[in-house]
């Protein structure tokens, strides 16, 4: 874990994380294993944000989550992105991912077959038909 020597700075960062994930503040004394899947995902993101990264890597953050948590997680990811942190997102929920992406890449068997802006890929009839069920 990343440690700050300055307790004040550490507390400020923790306050920022709790502001972004208020449910974690309510559950701060609860064992992580007893949190719901969405809460565990928020905890993982909060822990990663404690180090104030310039780049945040997220691998399938919506996997196994209830729809209400998926919307919340993507809203938080978009907020993190809009505040200046670069987010590299690997996600099978292409509609949600492309909806917040500046840039998107379509991979097939490990190779990039298409790349464009998130909105362009999301609105492409070919992409809709081939990958988004449209």
Label every PLM stretch briefly.
Residues 48-49:
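ABC ATPase C-loop
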Residues 31-35, 39:
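Conserved ABC ATPase signature
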Residues 103, 115:
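Short, glycine/charged-rich "phosphate-handling" switch motifs in NTP-dependent
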Residues 1-12, 20-25, 116, 134:
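ABC-type ATPase nucleotide-binding domains, specifically the catalytic core motifs of the NBD
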Residues 52:
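Conserved catalytic motifs of ABC-family nucleotide-binding domains
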Residues 71-83:
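Helical segment within the ABC ATPase nucleotide-binding domain
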Residues 56-60:
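Catalytic Walker B motif of ABC-type/P-loop ATPase nucleotide-binding domains
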């Amino acid at each position: 874990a990343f440690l700050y020597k300055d307790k004040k700075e550490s507390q400020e960062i923790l306050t920022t994380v709790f502001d972004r994930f208020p449910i974690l503040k309510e559950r701060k004394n609860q064992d992580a294993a007893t949190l719901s899947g969405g809460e565990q995902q928020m905890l993982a993101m909060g822990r990663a944000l404690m180090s104030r990264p310039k780049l945040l890597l997220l691998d399938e953050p919506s996997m196994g989550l209830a729809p209400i948590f998926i919307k919340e997680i993507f809203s938080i990811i978009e907020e993190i992105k809009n505040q200046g942190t670069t987010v590299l997102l690997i996600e099978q929920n292409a509609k949600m991912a492309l909806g917040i992406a500046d840039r998107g890449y379509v991979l097939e068997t490990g190779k990039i077959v298409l790349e464009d802006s998130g909105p362009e890929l999301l609105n492409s009839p070919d992409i809709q038909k081939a990958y988004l069920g449209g």
